[in-house]
Swiss-Prot record:
Protein name: Probable tRNA sulfurtransferase
Family in the record: Belongs to the ThiI family.
One Gene Ontology molecular-function label: ATP binding
Reactions catalysed: [ThiI sulfur-carrier protein]-S-sulfanyl-L-cysteine + a uridine in tRNA + 2 reduced [2Fe-2S]-[ferredoxin] + ATP + H(+) = [ThiI sulfur-carrier protein]-L-cysteine + a 4-thiouridine in tRNA + 2 oxidized [2Fe-2S]-[ferredoxin] + AMP + diphosphate; [ThiS sulfur-carrier protein]-C-terminal Gly-Gly-AMP + S-sulfanyl-L-cysteinyl-[cysteine desulfurase] + AH2 = [ThiS sulfur-carrier protein]-C-terminal-Gly-aminoethanethioate + L-cysteinyl-[cysteine desulfurase] + A + AMP + 2 H(+)
Entry's EC annotation: 2.8.1.4
Originating species: Staphylococcus aureus (strain MRSA252)
Domain THUMP: 61-165
One Gene Ontology cellular component annotation held by this UniProt entry: cytosol
Predominant subcellular localization, coarse grouping: cytoplasm
UniProt-annotated binding residues for ATP: M183, L184, H208, F209, R265, G287, Q296
Length: 407
């Protein structure tokens, strides 16, 4: 079947009342960004749904695949736009039915938004179903569990007919919920946390703490790849890479070994807090999960959060680990996250970290050195990369150049 339109159904933005126009406009912008590089289509965003008009050469599969990853879209259907007559509907219904397997079952589902259309919903279903039974052999009706369901929408401008419904990502359009800073470690949890807040319409920038020579270039490239995967859904994402070696060495030098993890996290939070204000964000996001490790108990979270007044969002706080792994696989970050390149947190993990840190003690340990000056140096020397869905690391660029030179 050759379709001439894609029907895009909105997610939660249909509930946004007087703000709906803002959400629709943002979604249309996100769709245009996602489809950049493709041609043969025109995006038409309307109040209650979006239509994408397709030319003959449009790559419908690639367009549909990209749309399915955009937050704010509930589902997508390749559709035929048909003139508003029973004759035209019947002719297209037969074309659909001619593709049915022998002895298969079908159902006609009609939605009539145009109440002035001369036939009501049930009359249309009977008329179109009867036409199929008369002209197509060895098929039958099954309204409960059909093999095929021909869907017909009678709207004010035209009639739209389709069979397939491709699930979207749901949620709200990214760009409607403000900006946050994601603490991206390179593990399984933080990319999922980033995806969860983006699903709520939030724009993210990411921060990663890099401690060479203790952490490798591969660990850095791993985080770049995770950011690239996230960017496939929302467009370019800024990744801020913090030189953290000086701070981390000093913490491990002067802080009691059981408290180094708590103090390290507090230093990270201080750096993130300064960057939040620089980039105009309103919250910090991390992948913490209650009770999963020593730094993620309530006592630890209290001690760590104390260094900032910026809201800290933890979208995975109550998830089971297995739930997080499933989501990681769904969004495509799992295989990258489990690559064996350690970040600065895992390399310096103490043997017996405190799970219920005494707040006064950690403050006392930190009081013996001037961490504020080190934090400022770390912020001043941040490396910022803009990661797109087709971003290539320096190593990948060099490899590609060698291949081109060889050819």
């Amino acid at each position: 079947m050759k379709y001439d339109h894609l029907l895009v159904r909105y997610g939660e933005l249909t509930l946004k009342g007087s703000n709906r126009k803002k959400f629709v406009n943002q979604l249309r912008n996100n769709v245009n960004k996602s489809l950049k590089g493709l041609d043969g289509f025109v995006v038409k965003g309307k109040r209650d749904r979006m239509y994408i008009e397709l030319e003959d050469h449009a790559d419908i599969n690639e367009i549909t695949n990209r749309l399915s990853k955009i937050f704010g879209i509930k589902s997508i259907s390749p559709v035929l736009k048909v003139e508003k007559s029973i004759e035209a509907m019947s002719a297209e219904t037969i074309k659909f039915a001619q593709q049915f397997e022998e002895n298969s079952t079908f159902k006609i589902d009609v939605k009539r938004a145009d109440k002035n259309f001369p036939m009501d919903t049930y009359e249309l279903q009977r008329e179109l179903g009867g036409t199929v039974l008369k002209q197509i052999e060895n098929v039958s009706v099954n309204v409960k569990r059909p093999d095929h369901e021909i869907r017909v929408e009678v709207r004010l401008d035209a009639i739209y007919m389709y069979e397939e419904v491709v699930p979207g990502s749901g949620g709200l359009p990214v760009g409607t919920g403000g900006k946050t800073l994601l603490m991206l470690s390179g593990g399984i949890d933080s990319p999922v946390a980033g995806m969860e807040v983006m699903r709520r319409g939030v724009t993210i920038e990411a921060i990663h703490f890099h401690s060479p020579p203790f952490t490798s270039d591969q660990a850095k490239e791993k985080v770049i790849e995770l950011t690239r995967i996230l960017a496939e859904r929302v467009g370019p994402i800024k990744l801020h890479i913090v030189p953290f070696t000086e701070l981390q060495k000093q913490v491990n030098k002067v802080v009691h070994p059981r408290y180094t993890m708590t103090s390290t996290r507090r230093m990270m939070m201080r750096v993130a807090d300064k960057l939040v204000h620089q980039i105009g964000a309103y919250a910090i996001v991390n992948g913490e999960n209650l009770g999963q490790v020593a730094s993620q108990t309530l006592h630890s979270m209290y001690a760590i959060n104390n260094v900032t007044s910026t809201p800290v969002l933890r979208p995975l706080l109550t998830y089971d680990k297995e739930e997080i792994i499933i989501k990681s696989k769904e969004i495509g970050t799992f295989e990258t996250s489990i690559q064996p390149f350690e970040d600065c947190c895992t390399i310096f993990t103490p043997k017996n970290p405190v799970t219920e840190p005494n707040f006064d003690k950690v403050v006392q340990y930190e009081s013996v050195f001037d961490f504020e000056e080190m934090i400022n140096r770390a912020v001043e020397n941040i490396e910022t990369l803009e990661i797109t869905s087709d971003y290539k690391t320096i190593k990948e660029q060099q490899t590609n150049q060698l291949i081109n030179d060889f050819l």
